[in-house]
């Protein structure tokens, strides 16, 4: 509720020139922006559906990983996928070191430390490292240390790899349908 109030206060005096009609007119299957948006809205629910169908706990991790990896250009997406996987593995290793060295009374603060780290991280790879702390701090209590670590890595790898493959196929199909090269197809 507080976020809504702050958003309203900061935006109430802005004039928006684009109405629903303008949004609908801007929809163009040959546009790289439209393709990127369609890829997001189709891929993320598919990842969640498949993770749930496979009875993977914490399916939202796969969905969030996919959502964060999907960017308009494939070259950028490939870098994000790589950074997400490396960042998660590094985050797991850092978490394991902290978990081993710190007393149990401090475990709850590992997640908070991760949140602070995400806030101060300018690079996506480092955000993935610190984001892992909070996720594992919660999941460890539910699944045990080994289960939480395995689940975190598996869900993230599944989410970003599926998103990469899906978007590559999606952009390829959209190029064939529209007859125009999409921005997403570059560098694949």
Task: For each feature predicted by the language model, list its residue ranges.
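Alpha-helical transmembrane segments and their membrane-interface boundaries
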Residues: 1-130, 137-188
């Amino acid at each position: 509720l507080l976020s809504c109030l702050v958003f309203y206060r900061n935006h109430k005096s802005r004039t928006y020139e684009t109405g629903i009609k303008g949004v609908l007119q801007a929809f163009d299957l040959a546009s790289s922006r439209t393709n990127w948006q369609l890829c997001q809205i189709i891929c993320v629910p598919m990842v969640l559906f498949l993770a749930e169908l496979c009875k993977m706990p914490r399916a939202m991790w796969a969905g969030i990983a996919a959502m964060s990896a999907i960017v308009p250009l494939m070259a950028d997406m490939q870098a994000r996928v790589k950074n997400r996987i490396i960042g998660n593995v590094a985050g797991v290793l850092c978490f394991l070191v902290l978990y081993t060295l710190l007393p149990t009374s401090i475990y709850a603060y590992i997640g908070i430390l991760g949140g602070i780290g995400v806030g101060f991280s300018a690079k996506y790879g480092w955000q993935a490292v610190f984001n892992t702390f909070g996720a594992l701090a919660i999941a460890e209590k539910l699944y045990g240390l080994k289960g939480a670590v395995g689940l975190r890595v598996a869900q993230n790898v599944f989410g970003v790899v599926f998103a990469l493959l899906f978007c590559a196929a999606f952009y390829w199909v959209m190029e064939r349908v529209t007859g125009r090269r999409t921005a997403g197809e570059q560098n694949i």
